Amino acid sequence: MDFPKSFDVIVIGGGHAGTEAALAAARMGSQTLLLTHNIETLGQMSCNPAIGGIGKSHLVKEVDALGGAMALATDRAGIQFRVLNSRKGPAVRATRAQADRALYKAAIREILENQPNLTIFQQAADDLIMQGDHVAGVVTQMGLRFHSKTVVLTTGTFLGGVIHIGLENHSGGRAGDPPSIALAKRLREMPFRVGRLKTGTPPRIDARSVDFSVMEAQPGDTPIPVMSFMGSVDLHPHQVNCFITRTNERTHEIIRGGMDRSPMYTGVIEGVGPRYCPSIEDKVNRFSDKDSHQVFIEPEGLSTHELYPNGISTSLPFDVQLQLVHSIQGMENAHITRPGYAIEYDFFNPQDLKHSLETKFVGSLFFAGQINGTTGYEEAAAQGLLAGMNAALRAQEKEAWSPRRDEAYIGVLVDDLITMGTREPYRMFTSRAEYRLLLREDNADLRLTEKGRELGMIDDERWRVFCEKREAIAREQQRLKSIWIQPATEKARKAAELLETELTREYSLHDLLKRPEMTWEKLSLLDADVAATPYEVAEQLEIQVKYAGYIDRQQEEIERLRRNENMALPADLDYSGIQGLSNEIKQKLTEVRPETLAQASRIPGVTPAAVSLLLVHLKKRGSLQRKSA
């Protein structure tokens, strides 16, 4: 039968991509249906119980700046918060939160159920309704037909999913959930290029069987960070420690002894796994010179004894898993509550997508998340938000929008995927962005919230908070420029103590803040209003003032790179001598010998960051010249 109501947007899948896609479309006023095989698993954290990290928190903050749910849910569920790279520059600082699985899932479900214009329905999707070369709806497992203007597929690991534990395997979308076989078969009949990827998860451990006294405690940060621009520490539940232990040579012997029954090393698994989140058997094999690897013991939540041992993801047989866990210090008597496993699934070449994440072959059909070859909750959420937003724009017959590489990490993610494709699960890093000083996690709202408001994704309360912050930054910056400290005054003497050098002329507070020795905290000793400035305003001002020169140069670089795209590359250029290029990129450039920067940028695997390095190298050797027409 046909469902009595038609929709503007149908989202298939209720994971991190699907929930953000459905919420984005509904926020924009589109009648949206979220179709999930199980309402109880909406927003489920299928793998590690954490949000954020290097490169990933930048995506979370951008999703938040555009009105998404992930950061707010993390603030409601986060049981430990840390800022990674806190001693490094602001471009690479990243917030990471350990999350209570149950609280996170509950927060997402509450947000979904209270979102206007959003309908949730429990049924697996088996087929797509087609009208010519466009999708026009979805057919469920029981034959129910839902009609819509657009469809967003966020199927995660469910398409043709196969779970492996040792040499045993069975069909599954994840442990305890059935795979999507009929839909996978239907998509394979379409002209998309399909491949197989794999990911894995470690065995879960009962905390009551672990000796934490021999492990290193890893507390959260004080003061406690927040993830959302609308969040606060008051939202956080009780905070807890994580712990660190290590594998040892005995562990590695056990793993090597089980390799003959590893589905990865016996050819049973054909899919490629994530390079930057390898299984423990992969680590032991690839890094045979190391006699130990860190294992982070992470609590799964406040109301459970289960632990997530981050660092020993495995698909080895269960008897080997048992031995390797028991060989690790502090886990000699550990009880495994769930075995580790690998899952292999279909993905589709993201080069078959537009920047909007609409497919090139089927109109009004959008892909987001692991179906595009990415790995990670944060990467999925970012794609989901973009796909849901563009599906709504398509339904409203409006022009699609996607951020440029210099506007957002979301732009970097999408551009990387559709330009270069991927042969392994794609993970975001700050190193993938050539404009990372502009794309900090702390300024995601200043970069994107105004655009989000224009697109209809920002509610009045978030807009009010954003405008107040932006105005406060402008006011305080102007005030710092207007307050001067004259030499030979009491404030000048105080400033000299802080700077460890005399002031020989007058300085504004703004000028003093530019000095590397002067921090916001020190500046507050010279001016009471500085001390009273809210943290989020002070943070922006300190970064903007101290890094103004670098930021201006990066802005100029963006403009220059556009102008210099057709610059000629010398035929005798020695790519092996260019510092910063990976060996893979050096090899490709040497083989192809591109004539111009533009041609170099189109070589698969040559990143925009590498093109920027080429441009810098050419300037240094003074060999920049335009290719004649």
Swiss-Prot record:
Keywords for the protein's UniProt record, in alphabetical order: Cytoplasm, FAD, Flavoprotein, NAD, tRNA processing
Pfam families: GIDA, GIDA_C_1st, SAM_GIDA_C
GO biological process, one term: tRNA methylation
An MF annotation (GO) of this entry: flavin adenine dinucleotide binding
Subcellular location per the Swiss-Prot or TrEMBL entry: Cytoplasm
Cofactor: FAD
Keyword NAD carried by entry: yes
Domain of life assignment: Bacteria
PROSITE patterns: GIDA_1, GIDA_2
Chain positions recorded as FAD binding sites: 13-18
Keyword field contains tRNA processing: yes
Stated family: Belongs to the MnmG family.
Known partners and oligomeric status: Homodimer. Heterotetramer of two MnmE and two MnmG subunits.
Function: NAD-binding protein involved in the addition of a carboxymethylaminomethyl (cmnm) group at the wobble position (U34) of certain tRNAs, forming tRNA-cmnm(5)s(2)U34.
This protein's name: tRNA uridine 5-carboxymethylaminomethyl modification enzyme MnmG
Species assigned in the record: Hahella chejuensis (strain KCTC 2396)
Higher taxonomy: Bacteria, Pseudomonadati, Pseudomonadota, Gammaproteobacteria, Oceanospirillales
